[in-house]
Each structure stands twice: as structure tokens, then as C-alpha cells.
Amino acid sequence: MSQLETXYDVMRRQGITRRSFLKYCSLTGRPCLGPTFAPQIAHAMETRPPTPVVWLHGLECTCCSESFIRSGDPLVKDVVLSMISLDYDDTLMPPRHQGTVEETMRKYKGEYILAVEGNPPLNEDGMFCIVGGKPFLDQLKHAAKDAKAVIAWGSCASWGCVQAAKPNPTQAVPIHKVITDKPMIKVPGCPPIAEVMTGVITYMLTFGKLPELDRQGRPKMFYGQRIHDKSYRRPHFDAGQFVEHWDDEGARKGYCLYKVGCKGPTSYNACSTVRWNEGTSFPIQAGHGCIGCSEDGFWDKGSFYERLTTIPQFGIEKNADQIGPRGRRGSGAAIAAHAAVTAIKRLQNKGDQA
């Protein structure tokens, strides 16, 4: 391995100066690891060759790739040309023979990362998704055989997404239903945030292992908190200030979108912290509630505009006379439930850190 060209060697060959390299390492770690990890990122890139990656596509809309190529920190060109060796991706590479996959599997047996976008259909022996004249189901099993680890990009690969919506005539399934003997990290979202995708790759390059995962197989660094808890509209939820109808006074004042269907209280993602388009905005900031696209089964859970629960809410600006005995009971239950979920989450985090 020492004779192989390291990621740093590749960058120097591309004309990158030492100063620019160190700046790059600092910026690369900022979204996911923090600037203090820049020395570790630099050491990893100086001592390890680019990680070989095979990226396959099944039943999907390619939105994960569309998100990935818009990463700002790091830029996708730096990821693809310097950090990893993207040996095969039929969307992001020039036309090449399918033999490229076989060559990578032979050359880097047990060392390459298999990234999967989309999912396999099981019905009719996988004939509902044919890539290069072969069922994607068979290609997926074959490519995973000698992989070091597997990345499930997006909700299609992680949960099944709309392809698996009832009645699911193609029997589309998430990839963990097919690949059961490999370390796997799920990066759900429809699509995932670009910097979340490149952040996962950065972590794996830096530490040579998968990041810490939650019980559903998602990286805790990005999926460890509810969107609701970090949303700038959260104070309006606590104050009982809600948008009741689209374009009402509450909507114009930026009140909480919970009553018009926002799934932020039950969705775990980095949307309210990392945000989209290089930190510019996210759906709730743009005035639309979260649809919970990173959560399993979101596509079959009813309208995006249905309220999560009918339990009454009350806020800090209302007094007991306005709420009434009935409202106090219902609202108290709602707040108790909300507080309980938050407290349980904090205890779980403390337990994980212990």
C-alpha cells in the first residue's frame, strides 16, 4: 500500500500547493467534523491512497447524484479527483465498459466501497430494473460480494422510497434486504444534503471506518437530532404560534408550520443546521413544512399537509381562562409527550457518550 499514490500525491500532481492543501483540509472537515480535525484529515490524505469506489444505480430518479455534484464543502470535483477513486459510476463518468467494475473488484478485493443509489426490485427475478442487459438485483449482489463496506445513498436505497409504495407491484426493497453480510451506512433523504454525502466520505477517508451509527444505521453526526429541535421556528411552537392556513397572518409572520403538516418533530436530519445550497436555506425556512423524507415509510403515511396529531396545543401567551379545563388536559398531555420525547433523547445521548 505504501507504494500507491496517496491522495496528497494526487493533489500535488494536479498543481495544488502545500498551503492550498492545508486550507482544503480545514474547509473539508468544517461541515461534519469541525475545523479542529483538519490535521487528522491532512494526515489521512498524506498517508492513504484514494479510496476506490464503485457507484451503482438501481430504481431511482438520480436526485442523490444531482445533490452530490452540488456540494460546496468540499467541492465534488475535489472529492472525485483527489479524495476517492471513483472507478465506476454510470452517471458521473465517461462511457466505459462494464468490465471496469470487474477490474476494480479484482484489483481492490476487500478494499473498495460500494455506493448504491436506488434499490432492487425482487419481482420477476429482478426484471423490472435492467442495467446493461442484466437485472440490477444480480449486479448488486455481485458487486457487494468483495466490498469493504456499503453506502446506501438516499431513501430509495435506505428504505425503499416511492418505488416501494403500496401496493409495490415490483417488490422494490431497500438494499439491506439483499445485502446482509457487509457493514452498511444509510444516508437517507430524498435526496440527502450534498454536504452530508461528502461529509460521510470525508469521515471514512479520515478514520478508515464508518462513523458512529444510530439503531437504524444512519450516521449520528447528521441524523442524531430532530429537525424540530434546531429549527428557527421552534420558539413559535413553544409559544403556540402556528400557521393555520397557507398565506394567513401566521404564515406571513413566520410562525410554526406544525398544524399544516410539518413533520419536523418526528424527522431526524441535518436540514436545520447544515441546510441546502451551501447553507442557504431549507424547506421550513422557505415556508414549506418538512415532509419527513429521511424517515422510513414517509411516502405511505398520508398527506404531506396533514397534522401529525389532533392533540390541542397552547402557548406561553395564553392564560388558563383562555385554555379552559378541557384544553389544559389535552395541552398538558401534548406538552408532557413532547417533553418526554426530548428527555428520552437526551438520556440516550448521555448513555451513548458514557
Curated annotation (Swiss-Prot):
Signal sequence, start to end: 1-44
The cofactor remark states: Binds 2 [4Fe-4S] clusters. Binds 1 [3Fe-4S] cluster.
Cite the EC number. Answer: 1.12.99.6
Annotated GO biological processes are: anaerobic respiration
Molecular-function GO terms, alphabetical: 3 iron, 4 sulfur cluster binding; 4 iron, 4 sulfur cluster binding; electron transfer activity; ferredoxin hydrogenase activity; hydrogenase (acceptor) activity; metal ion binding
Sorted alphabetically, the keyword list is:
3Fe-4S, 4Fe-4S, Cell membrane, Iron, Iron-sulfur, Membrane, Metal-binding, Oxidoreductase, Signal
Query: Would you tell me the Gene Ontology cellular component terms?
Result: [Ni-Fe] hydrogenase complex; ferredoxin hydrogenase complex; plasma membrane
Full protein name: Uptake hydrogenase small subunit
Q: What class of enzyme is it?
A: oxidoreductase
Q: Give the catalysed reaction(s), semicolon-separated.
A: H2 + A = AH2
So where does [4Fe-4S] cluster 2 get bound? 228, 231, 256, 262
Whom does it interact with, and what assembly results?
Answer: Heterodimer of a large and a small subunit.
Q: How does it sit in the membrane?
A: Peripheral membrane protein
What does the similarity note say? Answer: Belongs to the [NiFe]/[NiFeSe] hydrogenase small subunit family.
What Pfam families does the database record attribute to this sequence?
Answer: NiFe_hyd_SSU_C (PF14720), Oxidored_q6 (PF01058)
State its role: This enzyme recycles the H(2) produced by nitrogenase to increase the production of ATP and to protect nitrogenase against inhibition or damage by O(2) under carbon- or phosphate-limited conditions.
Cofactor(s) needed, names only, are:
[4Fe-4S] cluster; [3Fe-4S] cluster
Q: Which residues bind [3Fe-4S] cluster?
A: 271, 290, 293
Annotated [4Fe-4S] cluster 1 binding lies at 61, 64, 156, 190
| SUPFAM superfamilies in the record | HydA/Nqo6-like (SSF56770)
* Compartments in which it is found: Cell membrane
Q: How is it modified after translation?
A: Predicted to be exported by the Tat system. The position of the signal peptide cleavage has not been experimentally proven.
Q: Does the keyword rRNA-binding apply?
A: no
